[in-house]
Amino acid sequence: MAAPRIAHLAHKSVLELSGPDAQKFLKGLSCKDVEYLAGGYSGFLNASGRVLHTAFVFPRSKNSYLITHESPEDHPAPLTSLLPPFKLRSKVRIKDVTSQWDAWSAWGSDLQGGPSPIRTWKMGSGGASESHWDWEGGVRDLGLRDDEVGCWDLRAGWPHMGRQLLIPKGEKPSLATSHDLGNMDDYELHRMLLGVPEGPTEILPGHALPLESCMDIHGGVDFRKGCFLGQELTVRTYHTGATRKRILPVRLIPLDQTSSSSISDLLSSSPQQSLDEVSTPLDITYHPPSSSATRKPRSAGKILSLHNAVGLALVRLEMAERCWWSGDILRSSVSQWLDSGAGRLTTQVNGKEWGVYVGQGEAYAAALEHMSSSS
């Protein structure tokens, strides 16, 4: 078992909402109930239901909240600019407090023996799947100092993503005594392997849809709460639409692989070939099987981010199902797979063609299992 790790998320900004109307104000704008499970994953949409920000909300009291988010200089709607126009006469103060707090993530702890949350699913139409968590007897204590703030990160089940933390600026987290100090690369690889998209590179502001961005299965959207900005399209899609694409984990497969090892063994090992710096997004192409009446390649999605040969991609689910999720193709070697005439997904990286394996990620796999057992 890998040692637990803790990493500073230096790219995250921190916003504070405070005042008598802070709770009401936040409830009208965020797509998750701000009091649910004492904080957690949420987001902010535009009026047409497109994602502008994913965020973590940390309630400090009924009248005070801290929010971590990513608003780089090229963001079309920074959170510090998005929220103030909605204040009107609300008694709420909006303040950037990034200079006061550092965002951290801690994962990999042995949490056996204590209280564990229970996940249930509420299913919509066309593949929409709302993840809902409950703690019997109250939310488990995070084990933090009094001056630290945190919440459980349940995007990829329990306890895979561990804790999201806010630590007073420049101070060492108390959990650093029981966790190895990691870095941003460790955090990025960890969440990518679990199929957890995050931030404007992967969830494109003003374009990405909540369900395609897996905010439903990661517990970031509440389809039954009161009105919030962007609710109409989101709820309508949940009840009557179809989710044909999702952001899922991918692994690049070298097509010149000569090993007799199975693709399954290849996927479970560390990448043997490192990639030079790669500019994303990258187009994914679907090549129909040799038995298909139509052999013309088609677009299957885009790779949004890469960490060496591991990444996240917005993929057409139908094509991932055809290529990877049915049959025994994972037992084949790469050469057997290519010779079989089976359908496949590929991409071009720096002029070289690679195979693209699409995984389901923790949350989508759990949702599919629930749908299968309920049918």
From Swiss-Prot:
Name assigned to this protein: Iron-sulfur cluster assembly factor IBA57 homolog, mitochondrial
Main localisation: mitochondrion
Highest taxon above the source species: Eukaryota
MF (Gene Ontology): transferase activity
Organism: Cryptococcus neoformans var. neoformans serotype D (strain JEC21 / ATCC MYA-565)
Subcellular location: Mitochondrion matrix
The UniProt record lists the keyword Transit peptide: yes
UniProt keyword terms in alphabetical order: Mitochondrion, Transit peptide
Listed Gene3D superfamilies: Probable tRNA modification gtpase trme, domain 1
GO cellular component terms given for this protein: mitochondrial matrix
GO terms (BP aspect): iron-sulfur cluster assembly
UniProt similarity note: Belongs to the GcvT family. CAF17/IBA57 subfamily.
